[in-house]
């Protein structure tokens, strides 16, 4: 699963990354979510959303910048290409939970994530 590879990558860089919000969530963490996948000729392209959570909007934006640099400049085996599609403020207005979200296109050389 491409999500687990990305979580391992982010954890190795000191970022607390999960697939869902942990019960004992720290102040700063990210959630990795696959929002779509397409495969052809043993190449899989996944759309990955990474939500950066932090106690302030500034800290969420700074965490988002770290995530973008890690993702775009990685040379992780198995992740052939990573391209930033978009990033934006994703604050939950009703709960005042500060978040940023970055969306990436991730290419792997596996057919349907064996």
Q: What role is predicted for each listed range?
A:
Residues 1-16, 24-27, 33-114:
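Charged, amphipathic alpha-helical segments and their flanking helix caps
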């Amino acid at each position: 699963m491409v999500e687990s590879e990305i979580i391992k990558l982010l954890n190795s860089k000191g970022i607390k990354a999960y697939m869902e919000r942990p019960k004992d969530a720290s102040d700063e963490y990210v959630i990795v979510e696959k929002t779509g996948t397409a495969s052809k000729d043993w190449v899989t392209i996944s759309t990955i959303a990474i939500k950066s959570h932090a106690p302030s909007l500034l800290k969420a934006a700074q965490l988002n910048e770290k995530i973008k640099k890690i993702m775009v400049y990685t040379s992780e085996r198995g992740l052939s290409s990573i391209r930033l599609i978009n990033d934006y403020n994703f604050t939950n207005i009703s709960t005042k939970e500060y978040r940023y979200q970055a969306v990436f296109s991730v290419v792997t050389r596996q057919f349907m994530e064996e």
